[in-house]
Amino acid sequence: MARVKRGVTAHAKHKKVYKLAKGFRGRRKNTIRTAKAAVDKAGQYAFRDRKRKKRTFRALWIQRINAAVRPLGMTYSVFINGLAKSGVMVDRKVLSDLAITEPAAFLAIAEKAKAALAA
């Protein structure tokens, strides 16, 4: 049986790791052992932060909505309660965008929420 030398496959594997480690600093980009560890850790961070990104953006939308309804004499929680009572089914992302780009439309929604709270 012929002897199998793994130079080609090892080189291909290493090349794949180095490609993923491109842009890393120091030995993390060109030493296989540290590059592997760095790529693994980068993958862990990427996985974690894909989840965290959703939380962060939701918090940002809530802050923007809160800032937009405060001058109208409401807090965020009161505004959301008013929306629920009035039956307006607009998510926080859209509300946040409306507050920035279309203040008149946001004001109309806020008035509807206020009316539902009064009734």
UniProtKB/Swiss-Prot annotation:
Signal peptide: none annotated. The keyword rRNA-binding applies. InterPro entries: Ribosomal_bL20, RIBOSOMAL_L20_CS, Ribosomal_protein_bL20_C. Keywords: Ribonucleoprotein, Ribosomal protein, RNA-binding, rRNA-binding. GO terms for cellular component: ribonucleoprotein complex; ribosome. It comes from the Bacteria. The keyword rRNA-binding applies. HAMAP family: Ribosomal_bL20. Binds directly to 23S ribosomal RNA and is necessary for the in vitro assembly process of the 50S ribosomal subunit. It is not involved in the protein synthesizing functions of that subunit. Belongs to the bacterial ribosomal protein bL20 family. This is Large ribosomal subunit protein bL20. It comes from Rhodopseudomonas palustris (strain BisB18).
